[in-house]
Amino acid sequence: MSTREENVYMAKLAEQAERYEEMVEFMEKVAKTVDVEELSVEERNLLSVAYKNVIGARRASWRIISSIEQKEESKGNEDHVAIIKDYRGKIESELSKICDGILNVLEAHLIPSASPAESKVFYLKMKGDYHRYLAEFKAGAERKEAAESTLVAYKSASDIATAELAPTHPIRLGLALNFSVFYYEILNSPDRACSLAKQAFDDAIAELDTLGEESYKDSTLIMQLLRDNLTLWTSDMTDEAGDEIKEASKPDGAE
């Protein structure tokens, strides 16, 4: 068994054990060998799943803490607010470190070595996703910079996807889903978000009969998420508790 194969196997073990930080470490080692051989679809997905879990836990924590902070502020509990702000800062530094980690791997290794269109779109979409996660909690100039980097990455991915991938391809659909969420949540452009999501959905519907069996499940799942978001965004009930904007969680789709 080669070192690369061993790291992939260890990453799978770490995933089964739900030790995602270690899964990231193993897959980062694999990612740094792409100068010799590009990541397989399986390896690419393992890397994505590892980072998705590590970042996902912190994003969830940040949202909960931010919500508590708002409630305490509305009650005027200044002592509590000060404690919460410090704690939120700790979570934000973890988020920054994770995002910087994968963005460095993408920039230094994965994007330069990607040759098939599918790989390029996957990695550029991933780059956009992790800049978007930074934009979720950064403020001022840092938020603006993260948002601009997100837009550039998603736009580059979108140009390649439109030219090279079928409208029903799960990676193209996942990109459209996350790009539309970016317009809605980060740029506060609901019209652009709806337009992008609707276009992606309609283009896929028009070619649904060409969808292969292997990606049918993934593609139709992301199409459903696009439709869910469109329903949510076009309704007047976006402030209702329980309404949640959808991102695809599968690596072939979206982060």
Curated annotation (Swiss-Prot):
Keyword Cytoplasm: yes
Chief location category: cytoplasm
Localisation per UniProt entry: Cytoplasm; Nucleus
Protein's GO biological process: cellular response to nitrogen starvation; cellular response to phosphate starvation; cellular response to potassium ion starvation; cold acclimation; ethylene-activated signaling pathway; regulation of metabolic process; response to cold; response to freezing
Keywords: Cytoplasm, Ethylene signaling pathway, Nucleus, Phosphoprotein, Stress response
Modification sites for Phosphoserine: 66, 189
Modified residues (Phosphothreonine): 162, 210, 238
Gene Ontology CC annotation, any one: cytosol
Induction record: By cold in an abscisic acid- (ABA-) independent manner (at protein level). Repressed by phosphate (Pi) deprivation. Induced by nitrogen (N) and phosphate (P) deprivation in leaves, but repressed by potassium (K) and N deprivation in roots. Repressed by miR396.
Keyword Protease: no
Pfam families: 14-3-3
A GO MF term: ATP binding
InterPro entries per the UniProt record, alphabetical: 14-3-3, 14-3-3_CS, 14-3-3_dom_sf, 14-3-3_domain
Deleted gene: phenotype: Short primary roots and reduced size, with smaller cells. Disturbed levels of several metabolites (e.g. beta-alanine, threonic acid, phenylalanine, 1,3-diaminopropane dihydrochloride, citrate, glycine, aspartate, glucose, 1,4-diaminobutane, proline, palmitate and shikimate). Increased miR396 levels in plants lacking simultaneously GRF1, GRF2 and GRF3. Higher freezing tolerance, and greater levels of cold-inducible genes and ethylene- (ET-) inducible genes leading to higher ET levels, as well as slightly enhanced expression of ACS6.
Family, per entry: Belongs to the 14-3-3 family.
Assembly with partners or alone: Component of a DNA binding complex that binds to the G box. Interacts with IDH3, AGT3, GLN1-1, GLN1-2, GLN1-4, SAM1, SAM2, MDH1, METK3 and MDH2. Binds to 1-aminocyclopropane-1-carboxylate synthases (ACS) such as ACS2, ACS5, ACS6, ACS8, and ACS11. Interacts with FD. Interacts with DREB1A and DREB1B in the nucleus. Interacts with CINV1.
Task of the protein: Is associated with a DNA binding complex that binds to the G box, a well-characterized cis-acting DNA regulatory element found in plant genes. Involved in the regulation of nutrient metabolism. Reciprocal negative transcription regulation of miR396.
Name of the protein in question: 14-3-3-like protein GF14 psi
